[in-house]
Every structure is written in structure tokens, then in C-alpha cells.
Amino acid sequence: MSNHWLLPENIADVLPSEARKIEELRRRMLDLFRTYGYELVMPPMLEYLESLLTGTGHDLDLRTLKLVDQLSGRTMGLRADITPQVARIDAHLLNRPGVTRLCYAGNVLHARPAGFHATREPIQVGAEIYGHAGLEADVEIQELMLAALQAAGLSDIRIDLCHAGILEALLDGLPSIRRIEDALFAALETKDVSALREITQGMPQTERDALLALPTLYGGVEVIDRARATLPASPAIGRALDELVALATQVRGASINIDLSDLRGYHYHSGVMFAAYVAGLPNYVARGGRYDKVGEAFGRARPATGFSLDLREVAALSPIEVRAQAIFAPWDADPALRAAIVALRAAGEIVIQSLPGHTKELDEFNCDRQLVRQEAGWVVAPR
């Protein structure tokens, strides 16, 4: 007998207690973004594949579920990342001059999970700034990312900084790199120096030595001084290191690490990259950086920087308890009781009316008060 209730692997229902916390944190974060002047957008869950993947890397294509549109016969994709959609909205639909701040919150779907226990249906929350090429935008986005994590009750946060321009400068002028690109990035991300030695055989010695050094350039801000002494003294690398120093000095409320081989999303990013970690966990809880090239694919090159996080992961880590205070009301045909319940709900109170024959309360609510009949009518009293 088949189990009709089974869900696909790495897909799960969100039950009331988890859903309540997720919704509370979603509201907190969107309200926070609003105080910074970010406008909410809601891109569609489904787009034609060429639009959905425009300006993105090969890894997003692999994470995107595809299907055929029954109306047009064209291939469509279920979004695996909202950020490219928001870039399309800024470049093609809004088409505003100057700075635009946008934020979003919505489900995405992954063809494969990012990790063994990872969900294939994250709830992605993020914010983006378009139209400012200076480091000030990156500082604001990094500050907002920290504030969002703190709004979720997370503490002891560490920020890891990297820069896509360093690797780009090292690989510039190496036309054969495309053949080994994926293996190179995998070795750098895992800091597998032995694999790097094998992959970089035959490269010019200067570039090879620099690539082998990247996994060792990890630690506090002092790593940047070691990087200046170790990496080639090119203008592009010098500018990238200067930007990392400037960004690191602006961080408040988190410790800073430099990790010059943390290159996840390299194909996507064009400048500073950062990831937030909490103590005791190996995986990042939020990630962001600069991606100036994405809008160009939609016909309008725009400086852009932003961050995103998976709200389900953050909610699982959050110590915040969300158990709503409620008022218990008996079941009674008295019109005065009905009027009292309507008035309380209009004022924002949760009123749970007991149905006939049921006396057990739901654990999801803390009914610390009750409606009782007195001479003056129905009044709220402690329970």
C-alpha cells in the first residue's frame, strides 16, 4: 500500500509553531527594511527559463527546476534565487535614475538540496541597493544584514569577507582556465591545497603560487597585510584589498574574518563578498556582496549590492519564543458576548471561543485571560 502522505525528499510541511516563528521574523525583517527606505517587491514564482537565468552562473541553472509551459510550449523555471528577478525589475521595469532600494521575502525551490539536511524549499529574504557604485552601499547592506540577524535574536555573529576581484585578476589572461574552472573553485572553497597543486600544474608560476596561497589567507584583518606581501602587486588586487580594509573597519556588532578563498557565488559577484556565521555552526546564515554585471544582461548596467538569507534556517536558530497571548471565551448565544468578542478582535486581541463539547485548549496560544459574565456585561478577567 502506497503512502499518499509522503512528500519529496528535502521537502517538508511547516507546522504551526515553526510557521508562527517564521512569520514573526518575516514581519520583523520587512519592517526593519522599511525603516531604511527599502520597497517591497514580489516577483513571480515561475518565469521563462531564459529570463530567470539571464546574467547568472551555471550553478543557478543546475539548481533550477524546469517544466514546459502548457500554453506556449516554452521552457519555464521555478525560481531558485529571487535576486536575479529583483535585478530584472530594477533594470527593465522600474528603470529609475539614481539609487533604488528593494527588498523581498518569498519561497524558492531547488532541484537539489544545498546540503544533506538542507531544505529544497527555502524562504528567501533579502535586500538590494541599485545605482551606487561606492563602498557606502556595501556598508549599508552589511549593516542591514547584521540588523536583520539581530532582529531574529542571533548573537555572536562573525562576518567573513572576500573579494571576487582578486581571483578575477589572477585568472585574467589565462584562456585555458575555463576547462578547469569548476574544479579550481571547488578546491579553493574546500581549501584543498593538494587538489590545487594538481589543478594548477602548467600555469605560470606567479599565478600558481598566488592560487596556492589563497586558502592560507584566512584569519583576522591582519591577513590583508599578508595578502599584500604574498599576492602579485597588481592595481586590481591592490584596489580589492583596499576595499576589504575599508569595509572591515565599518563593521559594528560582529567579529571580522578575512577568507580569500571563500568564493561561493564567484560567477555572480563582481566585488566584495561577505557571509555571516554564528558560533558553533559551520554553514553561513546569510550571504551577500556586489554584483554589478547582472543588470547589464537586462539591457541596463547598474551598480548593485545586496544580501539574502533563508528564513527557515534563521528561525530554527532563533531563541525568540513566539507564543501569542489570547483571551478564552465560552460558547454562548448571548448577543452581548458576540459584540464583546468582535470589539476585542477589532482591537487586535486574539479571542479563542470554545466550541461545545471541547474543553482542551490549544498549546499554540497562552490564554491568560477570559471573558466572564458579570452584572455589567461580559468583561475580560485574569484566568
Swiss-Prot record:
Give a GO cellular-component term: cytoplasm
Q: Where in the cell is it found?
A: Cytoplasm
Gene Ontology terms: biological process: histidyl-tRNA aminoacylation; L-histidine biosynthetic process
Transmembrane stretches in the record are: none
Mainly localized where? cytoplasm
Q: In which pathway does it act?
A: Amino-acid biosynthesis; L-histidine biosynthesis; L-histidine from 5-phospho-alpha-D-ribose 1-diphosphate: step 1/9
Q: Which SUPFAM superfamilies match?
A: Class II aaRS and biotin synthetases (SSF55681)
Cited Pfam families = tRNA-synt_His
Question: Keywords of this protein's UniProt record, alphabetized?
Answer: Amino-acid biosynthesis, Cytoplasm, Histidine biosynthesis
Could you cite one Gene Ontology molecular function of this protein?
histidine-tRNA ligase activity
UniProt miscellaneous comment: This function is generally fulfilled by the C-terminal part of HisG, which is missing in some bacteria such as this one.
- Summarize the subunit comment: Heteromultimer composed of HisG and HisZ subunits.
Q: What does this protein do?
A: Required for the first step of histidine biosynthesis. May allow the feedback regulation of ATP phosphoribosyltransferase activity by histidine.
Which family does this protein fall into?
Answer: Belongs to the class-II aminoacyl-tRNA synthetase family. HisZ subfamily.
Q: What is this protein called?
A: ATP phosphoribosyltransferase regulatory subunit
Tell me which species this is from. Cupriavidus pinatubonensis (strain JMP 134 / LMG 1197) (Cupriavidus necator (strain JMP 134))
